[in-house]
Each structure stands twice: as structure tokens, then as C-alpha cells.
Amino acid sequence: TWTEAIDAMPSNLQMMFVHAYQSYLFNEMLSMRIERGLPINMPVEGDVVIPLDPNGNPQHENPVMTTAKNIDLVARQIRAGRAFVTGALFGSDSILAEGEMGEIERKVIEDNGLKAEDFVIPGLPRCSSKGGRRELMCPVKSIGSEFREDGYTLRFSLPKGNYATCLMREFMKSEMRDY
């Protein structure tokens, strides 16, 4: 059966399938947000924002819903680098945004024919995912560069869950397949 085939794989590879699909959905939501002209670096009403701790680590356990009453304060926190606007990593217990971003998140989920319970897999419980939120932008830390005769070296660090290939594409302005 398909469950036996997946169960035969290492557990980290099993979860990679789930995380890849969640990332695909996240990227669809992010693309729609950009297409609608919504900022990714500033909040709009209904956005879920994640504050950072004093060490700069996202506090996913303390999401803040952006409302008309708190939008100015939330925007100040984001401008100061103490919080980030997020998008859904869809799962069984996902907190979805409200307002226009909530509409986008729900549309992507609906267009893909998904329900929250689809991320609970009784036959493979370790592949179940509760979901969460991911920052729409990530800070690039410790960036440095060096020109040499034989090429160019770019050094940087990214928070966990972010991909250097995506950042490199922005620097190189070429498709990842061309690297």
C-alpha cells in the first residue's frame, strides 16, 4: 500500500513531503498577496504578525492579529525589526489571517481542495502536521562579500526554515536551474 511505501522511508524524508506541500501552498499565498499589491514588509488589517524575542528569534507561540486599533503599533514594531508579517503553513490546527490576507489563504486552500483534517494522517501519524505561520520576509544577517581573481564569494546567514537558493536567485537574477 502507499502507506507502507512511505513508512519504509526515513522519517525525515517522510516529513519532507508534507513540508514541501505546505511550502508550495505558502508560496501560492505569497504570490497572490504580491499580485494584489499588498505589502510583504508592512501589515494590513487582518495580518497575523509574529514578534521577535530579544535575540531576534520568532515567537511563533505569540501571534498578534493586526486590527484597526493596533495597526500603527504593529507597523512600528515591524519597522524596528521586532516583528514580521506572516503567511499560513497550512495544517490541521492552522491559524488563518483575517481581512484580505485571510481571503487569500482561504482561496488557496479551497483551490487545492483541502480541509484542515487532510493534514491528520491516521495511517502515518508522524506525517500529520498541525501547521503554523512563516514570516513573509526574512532578515539576512552577517552579510559580507569578497572579490577574488577566480570569482566572487558572498557570505550570509539566514534564520532556520529559509533557503539560500532563494536569496541567491535575487542576487544573481537568474533561475535556480542555471546555478
What would you call each of these model-derived segments?
Residues T1-Y179:
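Non-catalytic, substrate/partner-engaging modules appended to enzymatic cores
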